[in-house]
């Protein structure tokens, strides 16, 4: 892979030419596309639940806030804008500031203002790319006040806050959040740490993954899971970094030690060598592994816990007997006893259906793996793009008039693309009409921005850019107006120079001025 390393100290030398004409052409073209997409989404929408920004305000919200993206894959591009259009619906003003909702209708298991922490990691990953940082600043403050509710479901909150900080650095945000984050971490240790087993445990449902195959192996659906243990590692590591930033040396050493311990126990205790996968150990049993691979076994890769020697686990993602399906990935390997897709019992089952929540985790994990370790075994750019396209194409529904419309809901039939929970709830005349419509339980835009195009802000204020497109896949693309570490980043690729009328190759702009160029889009740029 060709690599470019460019420091900010060289910017004066490199930015003598302002390619404003190219950027203006892109802005005008994409602005028109945004208008068209919003018009389509609005016309196809039954606006049942309205929060801060209704559909009439959707176009202005997107124009004011989101990074612009265009590419040759128009279905992927449409899904990108659709997910921003739906995220906007979940921005909710309250007397105490903004929160980001999961469901649009109020549901009885939510906390104050209908907030639920379960998808928090996805909501922060996605929302950090909005220009207006107030939404997530307020939302973070909400969880710091509602500390008990922040532990109602598994939620790597310190990690999520730090990811937001990387895009919108503000030391006062860290300083204000840090005491509450320490309390939340301590609460997990007091309630979910099993000293005898040397692991954290969780109910599958409070991981947000109810009716799981591994959960059924314990009489109370509890287990020592790679999810909660990986989240606790990620939070300890984030708290150590925050402590260092704040000059809290003693805290830094404590949390570093906790993180190192957790990384070791995930690798030593939750890795099934015979299956070459991270698995659940059901609680109240003989400490043996669940016999099945479940998709959440990829979660440790989100946080850099495994080393390269375990990358063969990624072959399962593209194996039709593993997790691959037309509208997958499936939540359980398809070869396993216990895998099923049914329309009876609980409407939210994690024993086979495809869940956007899990798909987003897995794609984040795969992107991080390739960015960190390079391609290896099944961890390839081809696997990432193939799975991202499958995920994108799953964001569809055929309506009553036979028209295909963009849609995001709770869980999918991995073989037909039907939204299972929706079908079941409609049949039972459920009181919350269209409960899962526009469901804000996963990320997608972040997978394009930080994954596919590879914009990765760092704690120290640097920005690494490494696209994950297989060489020769696209002839052109542009991702512009990305707010990142106090700067505005744009990445423009044109193989021939004919599409945008610019120099062939990939150009990176910082604050509208050229900062780097490569002849290919296999590039790593440190700004």
Features from the language model and the residues they span:
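Acidic/polar, glycine-enriched structural segments that form the non-catalytic walls/loops
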Residues: 21-111, 171-173, 182-187, 243-245, ...
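C-terminal beta-sandwich/jelly-roll accessory domains of carbohydrate-active enzymes
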Residues: 475-527
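Extended glycan-interaction surfaces of carbohydrate-active proteins
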Residues: 74-113, 128-144, 190-224, 264-354, ...
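The feature captures the catalytic groove of carbohydrate-active enzymes
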Residues: 26-50, 57-60, 147-155, 189-257, ...
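Non-catalytic carbohydrate-binding regions of carbohydrate-active enzymes
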Residues: 157, 246-280, 312-487
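Well-ordered alpha-helical scaffold segments within catalytic/enzyme domains
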Residues: 62-74, 113, 121-131, 157-173, ...
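C-terminal motif of bacterial Sec signal peptides marking the signal peptidase cleavage site
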Residues: 15-16
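Positively charged n-region of N-terminal signal peptides that target proteins for export
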Residues: 1-4
């Amino acid at each position: 892979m060709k690599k470019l390393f460019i420091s900010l100290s060289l910017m004066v030398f490199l930015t003598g030419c302002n390619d404003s004409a190219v950027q203006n052409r892109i802005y005008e073209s994409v602005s028109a596309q945004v208008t068209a997409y919003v018009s389509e989404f609005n016309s196809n929408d039954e606006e049942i639940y309205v929060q801060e920004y209704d559909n009439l305000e959707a176009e202005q919200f997107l124009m004011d806030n989101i990074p612009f993206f265009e590419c040759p894959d128009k279905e992927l591009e449409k899904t990108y804008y659709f997910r921003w259009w739906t995220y906007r619906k979940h921005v909710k003003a309250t007397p105490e500031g903004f929160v980001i909702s999961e469901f649009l209708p109020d549901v009885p298991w939510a906390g104050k203002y209908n907030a639920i922490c379960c998808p928090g990691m996805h909501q922060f990953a996605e929302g950090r790319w909005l220009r207006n940082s107030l939404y997530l600043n307020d939302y973070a403050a909400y969880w710091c006040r509602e500390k008990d509710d922040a532990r109602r479901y598994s939620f790597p909150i310190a990690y999520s806050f730090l990811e937001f900080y990387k895009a919108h650095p503000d030391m006062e945000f860290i300083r204000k959040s840090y005491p509450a984050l320490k309390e939340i971490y301590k609460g997990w240790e007091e309630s979910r740490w099993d000293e005898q087993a040397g692991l954290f445990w969780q109910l599958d449902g409070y991981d947000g993954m109810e009716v799981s195959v591994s959960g059924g192996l314990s009489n109370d659906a509890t287990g020592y899971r790679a999810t909660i243990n990986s989240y606790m590692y990620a939070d300890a590591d984030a708290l150590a970094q925050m402590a260092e930033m704040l000059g809290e040396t003693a805290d830094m050493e404590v949390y570093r030690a906790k993180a190192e311990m957790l990384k070791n126990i995930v690798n030593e205790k939750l890795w099934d060598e015979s299956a070459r996968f991270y698995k659940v150990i059901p609680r109240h049993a003989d400490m043996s592994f669940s016999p099945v691979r479940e998709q959440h076994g990829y979660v440790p890769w989100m946080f850099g816990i495994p080393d390269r020697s375990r990358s063969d686990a990624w072959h399962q993602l593209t194996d039709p007997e593993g997790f691959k399906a037309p509208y997958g990935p499936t939540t359980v390997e398809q070869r396993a006893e216990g895998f099923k897709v049914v329309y009876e019992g609980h409407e939210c089952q994690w024993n086979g259906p495809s869940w956007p929540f899990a798909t987003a985790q897995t794609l984040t994990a795969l992107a991080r793996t390739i960015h960190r370790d390079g391609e290896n075994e099944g961890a390839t750019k081809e696997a990432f793009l193939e799975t991202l396209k499958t995920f994108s194409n799953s964001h569809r529904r055929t309506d009553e008039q036979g028209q295909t419309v963009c849609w995001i809901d709770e869980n999918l039939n991995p073989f037909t693309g039907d939204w299972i929970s929706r079908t079941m709830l409609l049949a039972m005349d459920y009181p919350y009409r269209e409960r899962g419509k526009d469901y804000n339980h996963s990320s997608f835009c972040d997978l394009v921005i930080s994954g596919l195009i590879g914009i990765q802000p760092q704690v120290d204020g640097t920005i690494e850019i490494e696209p994950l497109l297989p060489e020769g896949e696209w002839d052109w693309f542009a991702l512009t107006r990305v707010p990142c570490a106090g700067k505005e980043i744009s990445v423009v690729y044109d193989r021939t120079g004919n599409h945008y009328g610019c120099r062939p190759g990939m150009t990176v702009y910082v604050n509208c001025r050229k900062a780097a160029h490569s002849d290919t889009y296999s590039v790593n740029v440190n700004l």
